[in-house]
Amino acid sequence: RKIVNIEAETMVDMARRQILPAVEKFSSKLAQDIAVKKSIAPVVSGIYETTLVTRLSDLVEDIDAAVEDLAAALATFHKIDDVTESANMVRDVLLPKMAALRAPCDEAEQRTAEGCWPFPTYGDLLFGVE
């Protein structure tokens, strides 16, 4: 119970304070780049960038909704005193909501430029240890 609570609280905090701002900053920069390219060369389609900005915006919405959903579930979880009831809530509610938050965050990581992502990549962790 305690470990899942810490993990869920950490997910909420990381998403709110680091992931959402990083994705927003990257997508805003990308949108500015599209505008600059089109002002210089109006024939530039910017399809890739426009599609990416749109998808990142959708992911921001998904992440935000999942964060709020998980935070609300945590608020309910904190009010439960019964061990069996809290264990059932972990299994039936918290873990699925944590997975629901992780999915759009993982996709956002894949679509956000490495230098803009606030955490080391899996490759950095696997091969960067000396």
Predicted segments, located by residue:
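C-terminal amphipathic alpha-helical interaction region
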Residues: 1-130
